[in-house]
Amino acid sequence: MVSAFYAFLDYLKNIKAASPHTLRNYCIDLNSFKVFLEKHGKLSPSMPICLFSKERQETNLPFSLFTKDAVRLYILELMQENKAKRTIKRRLSAIKSFSHYCLKHRILLEDPTETIHGPRLPKELPSPITYEQVEILMATPDLSKYTGLRDRCLLELFYSSGLRISEIVSLNHWDIDFNSNLIRIRGKGKKERIIPITTLAAQWLKQYLNHPERAGVAKDSQAIFLNCFGTRLTTRSIDRKFQKYLRLSGLSGNITPHTIRHTIATHWLENGMDLKTIQALLGHSSLETTTIYTHVSMKLKKQTHNESHPHG
């Protein structure tokens, strides 16, 4: 069964173009289930599944242990361990995806997860920040330094286009057309889309790309955003920089790069952009995903109304 886990992870990586973050989560979730099955089947613990390991140890974990009862017991055990509902939901989702892969490749004849459902999650609306907070964040990088210029450019691009952090780090030189102010994005599942950027974002990009210090450190001739060693920035390093600027700006709350994506989507909607256009710009596969911003916009309107009304 462990070889099937690895085949599934290879499929996610090579065919479905899953991000390293997604692959890490799948490894964590499948390892958790594997440990449970080994314990449930009274088998000796084996090496954890690691997609990036050169050694892939096969074990005697039989598919006969992968039953509906086993999956139910596993979910029950997670609940008894007081795991968060979102964690339980994600782990069940990983097992279901693995099961569907096995059915598709005729490794399994029946789906052990078919009638099993995870816990219901409360609908959480994304919390955008205000125009004023966006301006405060933008003004934080030190523009006297090359790295500050790069980081201002990053922030401007996040807000200009609502890009995911993984889409920002994967940007290459040939993805940007300065004549039309358009950029080509490789989104989830290798789906490409072409979206506009603001004139201001284009100006910051040109200034950053033409900076002599950037040319001096560049080792990666393709990547747009480089670290101080001249290689492509990672999602983790951008996350760290983002948190640094939050501290320096004095802004409080749970604000992440993804918050900026939620923010510009909400601002687009408030300024009259239709949902289909927002869906295309954000790269949502379903309009239902985009519709959540109508609820966010209404929530903000109600909040503003209550705060501004004399009887509020």
Curated annotation (Swiss-Prot):
Residues 124-306 form the Tyr recombinase domain. One of its GO terms (molecular function) is tyrosine-based site-specific recombinase activity. Keywords: Cell cycle, Cell division, Chromosome partition, Cytoplasm, DNA integration, DNA recombination, DNA-binding. Its main location: cytoplasm. Residues 1-103 form the Core-binding (CB) domain. Gene3D superfamilies: 1.10.150.130, Intergrase catalytic core. The active site is at residues 164, 188, 258, 261, 284, 293. It is found in: Cytoplasm. GO terms for cellular component: cytoplasm. PROSITE patterns: CB, TYR_RECOMBINASE. SUPFAM superfamilies: DNA breaking-rejoining enzymes (SSF56349). InterPro entries: CB, DNA_brk_join_enz, Integrase-like_cat_sf, Integrase_catalytic, Integrase_recombinase_N, Integrase_SAM-like_N, Tyrosine_recombinase_XerC/XerD, Tyrosine_recombinase_XerCD. GO terms for biological process: cell division; chromosome segregation; DNA transposition. Site-specific tyrosine recombinase, which acts by catalyzing the cutting and rejoining of the recombining DNA molecules. The XerC-XerD complex is essential to convert dimers of the bacterial chromosome into monomers to permit their segregation at cell division. It also contributes to the segregational stability of plasmids. Forms a cyclic heterotetrameric complex composed of two molecules of XerC and two molecules of XerD. Belongs to the 'phage' integrase family. XerC subfamily. This is Tyrosine recombinase XerC. It comes from Chlamydia felis (strain Fe/C-56) (Chlamydophila felis).
